[in-house]
Amino acid sequence: MPPIDFAVLAQVCAPWVAPQTMAAIVKTESSFNPYAIGVNGAKLTRQPANKEEAIVTAQWLIAHGYSVDLGLGQINSYNLRKYGYSVSDAFDLCKNMTLSASILEHNYQSAKKAGQGDQAAFEVGRQ
């Protein structure tokens, strides 16, 4: 896979969130690994080497009851179902960025409505 031009990806796929904000989140969540899989309560022996391996691994984990976080923004498997995304979508760079930014924005706005300050709302938005 060619190197990711993250600034362009963020600008095209999640233009309503500052690219610097998305970069900080993705760096923390996946270290910019588009095939990253985080298994909540467990750990993979190794991370997938490509998109196909990531999809098969994630599908197996979900089918066996694991809660997993997928791709650049580490989208949780619960949110895939909630927002109508597939496991394959989670490993599509643009779709992952779009959904990650949408979840961030939704959670941020919900926290603001609940009276949280900007920084506290941002922390809630990242969850």
Regions found by a protein language model. Give the residues of each.
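Alpha-helical segment that forms one wall of the substrate-binding/catalytic cleft
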Residues: N50-D118
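Export/targeting segments at the very N-terminus of extracytoplasmic proteins
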Residues: M1-W60
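Solvent-exposed, polar/charged alpha-helical surfaces in well-ordered, non-transmembrane soluble domains
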Residues: A7, P19-A23, K95-E105, E123, ...
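Surface-exposed patches in mature extracellular/periplasmic domains of secreted proteins
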Residues: Q20-A24, Y35-A36, L70, A111-R126
